[in-house]
Amino acid sequence: MFKDISIKDFDPVLAKAMAAESVRQENHIELIASENYCSQAVMEAQGTDLTNKYAEGYPGKRYYGGCEHVDVVEQLAIDRAKELFGAEYVNVQPHSGSQANSAVFLALLEANDTVLGMSLDAGGHLTHGAHINFSGLNYNAVQYGLVEGTGLIDYDQVESLAKEHKPKMIIAGFSAYSQVVDWARFREIADEVGAYLLVDMAHVAGLIAGGVYPSPVPFADVVTTTTHKTLRGPRSGMILARDEKLAKKLNSAVFPGNQGGPLMHVIAAKAICFKEALENNFKTYQQQVVKNAQAMAKVIQERGYEIISGGTENHLMLISLVKQEMTGKEADKWLGDAHITVNKNAVPNDPKSPFVTSGIRIGTPAITTRGFNEAQAGALAGWICDVLDSRGDEAATAEVRSKVEAICKELPVYAKNQ
């Protein structure tokens, strides 16, 4: 029925845009902390005929026939995730990290219940209670922040707010925090007020799987994550728990509460991702991610730029540009012109709008996948500072761009593109 025809032949306009993106990924340095390069095997799984299969329900209990093979696929993903993170319960069906969080809210809370989460400008996420998100619109969201001067999580404030507001759920986790989180302290505070503890480990899931960042699974009631970022899998989500007492509620919240049919081709890609993460070389990769981040942070600080919290113990750093009287939007543009991709990001007490900001966030998962070592990461940090110091000067930008071009050729992402 279907002709054996390529995208290029059938839809050349789309093919051109896709090819251009492949070129961009090969020729630009990727420093967005939430991005990474997945393996060809992960991409292959997402292009299979599993995409045709509807499979509402869970393995062994589907609402459609013909699910005997996709049951095997999903169970493989579940079992591997359990082994990887030491969890008793895993749901691999959420389409994203945000939908995983949404399902947890649906499972554990009633409308207008109080939740306590990290504010966006302190490094939290939209789904941790931001007023423009479902978590802030449908629930009474209280926000905690950082200790002024150190940039570390203000655990005393978390405890004080918890005692004052008696939240039904406390959220730990972040999208732009570069230090180690004290999961045990969050557990103590949650127990003190009788709250559920949800940990969103999306950014550090790979580091945790690799044993270079402490796991929240023994402490949290529920853990959510994406499967890309440091985990280096497909763009998707997952829910885990230390025991199965909440399994029925969580499963029902994902399906039918929050989603219909799962994406079986993506779940297959998750199974591959988890198998890759169980390999010995994955730990070596995660160790290098942190080493590269620390090498970059050292140079950036030596060049006079402030890193919120004073450094990094994970894969990312949030750089304040307030002292330089520079906006994140400007820095994003100037570095982009040099073929270095970052994202503008709010900093604590940011006077600028979220679309402008006073900071940038950078991370090392993608460059480490590419093969960068500490020396190359440190050199890259210097190039970033050269561009920012020049405020986007054309000559300085061109010089850095030529260096970027050279190292991208030296360290290709995918050999097939060379």
Swiss-Prot record:
Any Gene Ontology CC annotation: cytosol
Name of the protein this chain belongs to: Serine hydroxymethyltransferase
Binding site for (6S)-5,6,7,8-tetrahydrofolate: L120, G124, H125, L126, S353, P354, F355
Residue(s) at site: Plays an important role in substrate specificity: H228
Family as reported in the entry's similarity comment: Belongs to the SHMT family.
Quaternary structure and interacting proteins, as annotated: Homodimer.
Catalyzed reaction equations: (6R)-5,10-methylene-5,6,7,8-tetrahydrofolate + glycine + H2O = (6S)-5,6,7,8-tetrahydrofolate + L-serine
Pfam families: SHMT
UniProt xrefs under InterPro entries: PyrdxlP-dep_Trfase, PyrdxlP-dep_Trfase_major, PyrdxlP-dep_Trfase_small, Ser_HO-MeTrfase, Ser_HO-MeTrfase-like, Ser_HO-MeTrfase_PLP_BS, SHMT-like_dom
Annotated source species: Psychrobacter arcticus (strain DSM 17307 / VKM B-2377 / 273-4)
Domain of life: Bacteria
Cofactor: pyridoxal 5'-phosphate
Predominant subcellular localization, coarse grouping: cytoplasm
GO MF term set: glycine hydroxymethyltransferase activity; pyridoxal phosphate binding
NCBIfam families on file: PRK00011.1
Protein EC: 2.1.2.1
Subcellular location: Cytoplasm
Function: Catalyzes the reversible interconversion of serine and glycine with tetrahydrofolate (THF) serving as the one-carbon carrier. This reaction serves as the major source of one-carbon groups required for the biosynthesis of purines, thymidylate, methionine, and other important biomolecules. Also exhibits THF-independent aldolase activity toward beta-hydroxyamino acids, producing glycine and aldehydes, via a retro-aldol mechanism.
GO biological process terms, semicolon-separated: glycine biosynthetic process from serine; tetrahydrofolate interconversion
Pathways per UniProt: One-carbon metabolism; tetrahydrofolate interconversion; Amino-acid biosynthesis; glycine biosynthesis; glycine from L-serine: step 1/1
